[in-house]
Regions:
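Short charge-dense sequence patches
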Residues: 47-63, 77-96, 118-134
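Cytosolic regulatory modules rich in charged/polar residues
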Residues: 83, 87-97, 101, 105-127, ...
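Helix-boundary and N-terminal cytosolic regulatory elements
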Residues: 1-83, 106, 142-160
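A short, ordered amphipathic alpha-helix with a cationic face
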Residues: 75, 99-101, 136
Length: 207
């Protein structure tokens, strides 16, 4: 169970409306009076796991998180509502740049293999990586919109810093997406060249 420090007191983060998580397909927040509600769709960094989902409810007195998949492994602290949600979102993306750098290294290895004409299964590798990159690109776009709304709700300049971090992550995924397209085209060119060579060989044999 995770706990939150809020207004100097340790508070239990309760599970709320767990069934509604099944309907989460994107990230968004909504504020009505002093009550903030949010739902979040988080792509997985692991091949063996699907996307993860959680929801929050936050007001001047309570900070409630529905997190049945245990996304948050650490305490979430804050002396006011905006600090709670700000720290929560920073936890969400704290390892993302390192994850994206590892994706780039994988793409570079694929490029090296393509250049040296060694290895196989390029198409499936590139396809899986493009799916991952696309999922994170969409996620960051949604999170940027969420942070812009939070900045409007709470008028806290710390959200501007968080938005800049998300924009940098989004820019990286855009670059990786373009890189993966180039690798796919390189692979397709090699496939077509091999097919042409085979056809030329068959033509010579049959004449």
């Amino acid at each position: 169970m995770v706990y939150s420090f809020f207004k100097g007191e340790i508070m239990r983060i309760e599970v709320i409306n767990e069934k509604r998580l099944n309907h989460i397909h994107y990230c968004r927040v909504h504020k009505e009076n002093q009550q903030l509600s949010g739902s979040f769709w988080v792509p997985s960094k692991s091949k063996s796991k699907n996307k993860k989902m959680f929801s929050i409810e936050l007001n001047d007195r309570n900070f409630l998180v529905c997190d049945p998949e245990h996304i948050f492994k650490q305490k979430i602290s804050g002396n006011k509502p905006s600090e709670c949600i700000l720290n929560l979102m920073n936890i969400l993306i704290q390892e993302d740049m390192e994850f994206l750098q590892k994706l780039e290294m994988k793409l570079e290895r694929i490029e090296d293999q393509l250049m040296s004409h060694t290895g196989s299964h390029y198409e499936s590798q590139i396809f899986e990586m493009r799916k991952t990159i696309s999922a994170f690109d969409s996620y960051y776009d949604q999170m940027i919109e969420v942070v812009q709304n939070l900045q409007e709700f709470y008028n806290d300049t710390h959200f501007e810093t968080l938005e800049k971090r998300l924009i940098r992550l989004s820019n990286v995924t855009d670059r990786l997406a373009e890189y993966s397209i180039q690798l796919r085209e390189m692979h397709q060119t090699q496939v077509e060249m091999r097919q042409n060579q085979i056809m030329q060989f068959l033509t010579i044999v049959t004449t």
